[in-house]
Amino acid sequence: MPVITLPDGSQRHFDHPVSPLDVARDIGPGLAKACIAGRVNGELVDAGDLIESDAQLAIITIKDAEGLEIMRHSCAHLLGHAIKQLWPDTKMAIGPVIDNGFYYDVDIDRTLTQEDLDLLEKRMHELADKDYDVIKKKVSWQEARDTFAARGEDYKVAILDENISHDDRPGLYHHEEYVDMCRGPHVPNMRFCHHFKLQKTSGAYWRGDSKNKMLQRIYGTAWADKKQLNAYLQRLEEAAKRDHRKIGKQLDLYHMQEEAPGMVFWHNDGWTIFRELEAFVRMKLKEYQYQEVKGPFMMDRVLWEKTGHWENYKDAMFTTSSENREYCIKPMNCPGHVQIFNQGLKSYRDLPLRMGEFGSCHRNEPSGSLHGLMRVRGFTQDDAHIFCTEEQVRAEVNECIRMVYDVYGTFGFDKIAVKLSTRPEKRIGTDDMWTRAEEDLAAALTENGIPFEYQPGEGAFYGPKIEFTLHDCLDRAWQCGTVQLDFFLPGRLGASYVGENNDRVVPVMIHRAILGSMERFIGILTEEYAGFYPTWIAPVQVVVMNITDSQSDYVQQLTKKLQDAGIRVKADLRNEKIGFKIREHTLRRVPYMLVCGDKEVESGKVAVRTRRGKDLGSLDVNEVVDKLLKEIRSRSLHQLEE
């Protein structure tokens, strides 16, 4: 009979098989009430699953990450229960858990509206309020198929036919009259599923294949309690206000149009931000001793066959033909950088060789995945590749990490999650080579005092990598930076250097990206700052305004003085009330507004206001210029007097 060992090392002895819920009851009524599931010998199981032999057991509650995920998955089933009651002819496809919630793909003969979602959510609450038990039954494959065939659930039948072995015993979860199929676990009772919200719908092809039928995907979020739900909804509301697509339109930064899906039309102010960002990274390239190069926009398909991209990546590549030759528009810069390395004989004394490029790349992303600047088809990578010896890897990775944190810190990103992905099952190279490479990456992180998580088996087949994920002010994660070792591509493209013993040696290549995509990073910055860019990167840094026509000459003189100092400035001499001008430029998020009236003209001063509404008073013109230049040149995140 089972001896159950709990996480604190204590043991409970039973003379019959017990479930996690039974053990929770044995410990106390509070834990029994909170029990959602169990982890038996490391494996998640339903609260009612029987344990027949000695086992390690952890009781899972809503406070655990696994408990929250289980509850969210059960909310997807609750959605299925509700939609089948409201529209019985609906056919259910798949309903997984996603970050912060769940979705369900459904085949329904109506286009779901917001009113439908409200009705559906209301029915879900009515069902959850009944606090009914969820009954799990393990059945044969044939019984599961017969159950769903009788209910007209064609997609469930297809899943059984195509994805589940006939020897398996699928789990059927009964929500009163509604039945769903899942590996589980799920909540034992619907009392755990009360704090949810249906959010939106979108189209989704069955199996993700555009040849299949388009289904409707219903998204929802679910949380452990009302407070967490409301906090999340408030974050979403704030995120909507910060949406870079909305701000981009308000500030006239860029636009996109159907004739060029996923390609950015940069307007003057947006392109100013782009160029400032590029200039900053270019300065860092010089500081960290990189060459800056520029590779061709497209290259012959033969080269991409050599690299393996044609075999593994061709669906994501744009191609064109000329004079009976097929060309690929580059999706990445690395093959071009190897070609530059290959020009001329290289010695070990020439290494490390650091090569950076603002490379214009294109990838044929699915049209449904395109999202403003965050997911595009045409983008600019701040890409770099370092060619070095095996002995130089650790020092070079160390410098890459320093550069990554140097750049991110300038923009105020200090919450950075770091993951080290190690050798996958299918890989090239020897175990010794991989061990040394992984140790070099880990040591470089440790030497820089950076905590990190291992991602076992998640490295590329050609080398381990470090990933840097930024967390913004809304705690959203953005994976931007990468340091990737590559033992494969240089050799495949014939790269070598003359070693100390006059032998030919293939260099190690380090792929290094910091911003990732310039376009995406501008999108991230726009949402992080809500369009209130630090002065150094703001498209217009200062607007000088007159109150009446009598100050026009003074405004123009002051504007020229600021321009000559290298400050991006505009004069606003329109015949409008000063309050109107201030409101307009405040909405445009211009960092500083300089107001000139007769008093300022007489004193040779200027009244200074910030976009946050702070009145800095009347200041000497030279003092204003000096302070602005100091703020801009230091790339300060804060304005004067903040």
From Swiss-Prot:
Its cofactor is Zn(2+). One of its GO terms (molecular function) is threonine-tRNA ligase activity. Residues 243-534 are annotated as: Catalytic. It is found in: Cytoplasm. Binds 1 zinc ion per subunit. One of its GO terms (cellular component) is cytosol. It catalyses: tRNA(Thr) + L-threonine + ATP = L-threonyl-tRNA(Thr) + AMP + diphosphate + H(+). Belongs to the class-II aminoacyl-tRNA synthetase family. This is Threonine--tRNA ligase. It comes from Serratia proteamaculans (strain 568).
